[in-house]
UniProtKB/Swiss-Prot annotation:
GO terms for molecular function: FMN binding. Pfam families: Flavodoxin_NdrI (PF07972). One of its GO terms (biological process) is protein modification process. Belongs to the NrdI family. Probably involved in ribonucleotide reductase function. It comes from the Bacteria. NCBIfam families: nrdI. InterPro entries: Flavoprotein-like_sf (IPR029039), RNR_Ib_NrdI_bac (IPR020852), RNR_NrdI (IPR004465). It comes from Staphylococcus carnosus (strain TM300). This is Protein NrdI.
Length: 130
C-alpha cells in the first residue's frame, strides 16, 4: 500500500522514515497540484493552526481523493481537542477510516502500531479485491 504524507515541520517525515516503508510519496507545495496517484494509498498528515487541514493536503486531495483508503494524523497534544484534528476532518469528508494518531514524531510503539495497521489494511484490501 502506498503511503502519501505531508510534513509541515519534518516530524511526519521522520516518522515515515522510521517505519521503513519504501512505497512512499511526500507531498509538498511544489508538487501537490501536479501529482496524480492511480493506486490506493494511506495519507499521513500533520495539522495546522487550530485543527485545520493544511492547504497542501487540501490541494492534493482535490486531485487524488478517490484513491485514499485511510488517514493517519500527527499533532501535538498541547492543542487539546484540536490534536491531529486534520485527520478527523479528512476521515469524515472522504469517508475513510482514521487508522491512528501520533504525537510529534511518534514513539517507537507508534511506529510499530502504524506498520501493523498499514500492513493489515493492505492485506484486508487485497483480499477484498480478489
Amino acid at each position: 500500500m502506498k503511503v502519501v504524507y505531508f510534513s509541515f515541520t519534518g516530524n511526519v517525515r521522520r516518522f515515515i522514515a522510521r517505519s521503513g516503508f519504501e512505497n512512499t510519496l511526500e507531498i509538498t507545495n511544489d508538487n501537490c497540484a501536479e501529482v496524480r496517484i492511480d493506486e490506493p494509498y494511506i495519507l499521513v498528515t500533520s495539522t495546522i493552526g487550530f485543527g485545520e487541514v493544511p492547504d497542501v493536503v487540501q490541494t492534493f486531495l482535490r486531485h487524488n481523493g478517490t484513491m485514499i483508503r485511510g488517514v493517519v494524523g500527527s499533532g501535538n497534544r498541547n492543542w487539546g481537542q484540536n490534536f491531529a484534528k486534520a485527520s478527523d476532518t479528512i476521515s469524515k469528508d472522504y469517508m475513510v477510516p482514521l487508522l491512528m494518531k501520533f504525537e510529534v514524531q511518534g514513539t517507537k510503539k507508534d511506529v510499530e502500531e502504524f506498520k501493523d495497521k498499514v500492513g493489515h489494511f493492505y492485506e484486508d484490501n487485497e483480499r477484498k479485491a480478489i
